[in-house]
Amino acid sequence: MKKVLFSPINFAVVAGLMSLVGLTACTENSQQPTSQPNTAQTSAPTEVAKAPLKELTIAFATRRDTKDLQSKVDQVSAILSKEIGIPVKAVIGDETASVEALKADRANVAFLSGRAALKADTLAGSKMYLAEVRDDYSGGKTYDSIFVVPENSPLKTLADGTQTLEQLRGKRMAFTSRSSGSGFIFPVSELVGLKFVDGPDRLEQFFGKVTYGDGYSSALQAVLRDQADVAAVSEYALLPPWITAEEGKKLRVLHAVPNVPAHGIVIDDNVPADMREKLINAFLKLNEPENSELFRSLYNSTKLVKVDHEPHLAIMRTAIERAGLKP
């Protein structure tokens, strides 16, 4: 007797199963293409192309040690424009106005201090790419914040900062201003770090009297006129034009706080990467012999050097936080 491999019923069952498998496969194959576009639609682009700039605006900071600034920045702008291939417009203003201009896209580049650069980063996404180097900066691209006393002051520089600054308890203190990095932020950070004060609102609990000037000169003049026992300024403020050479001989450094980050060139994030590189290289042209005298006449800088935003400004950020302040 022959065995029947496929009865009508068995064949029908098998055929049905095969049809079901085929239907499932077809269904899966037909679904895959529709799922891919959905994924593509929900994925955000990693980088948005920036429109080419037709003109650059650079905000140059006002400084007391610079004369005829507009004429000089116009010459610098002409050099930069030639290098990058588009017009460069120069404007002059204080740091607050410069940061606001970056935020409002009225400026693409600014020359700022460390604290202002951090604020520009927060408000506008701008970063520092170049820092100045000066002969009167002891650290090259960093400088010292200093506590200054009269040459004949009984206050002495002792074995360490704690012993030295302990002598200031009850004394009359003159800060450069409430916004100065070297003349307020770093000195207060040092005092907080050494546990003499809890923050900027507790200074009167340590000092006998606290005053704030409108710049380095006014703070130093308070000491020279015996209106204060000590002043906090930048190390380069002991030189003209802040005070005369003769006045400088009547003062001395009691204590120094190092590594205040140098001022530098901040570029906004609305500048495309290729233009940013062109601009950085154009600024570095100011270091060359034919441009160095003009560049030095701006802010007494000897050259510009490349920096990484975060490492260069990290100590400023720490000082601000420790002093209980905001950028």
Predicted regions and their residues:
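Periplasmic-binding protein-like
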Residues: 57, 61-62, 130-146, 204, ...
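Ligand-binding cleft/hinge of the Venus flytrap
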Residues: 75-84, 182-212, 242-246, 319-322
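Short, polar/charged alpha-helical segment
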Residues: 42-45, 50-51, 55-58, 65-87, ...
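C-terminal motif of bacterial Sec signal peptides marking the signal peptidase cleavage site
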Residues: 22-25
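A conserved helix-loop-strand patch within extracytoplasmic ligand-binding domains
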Residues: 133-184, 189-194
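Short helix-initiation/N-cap motifs at beta->coil->alpha
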Residues: 90-103, 115, 198-221, 259
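A ligand-binding cleft/hinge motif common to bilobed small-molecule-binding domains
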Residues: 114-125, 187-193, 221-249
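Bacterial signal peptide processing site
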Residues: 27-30
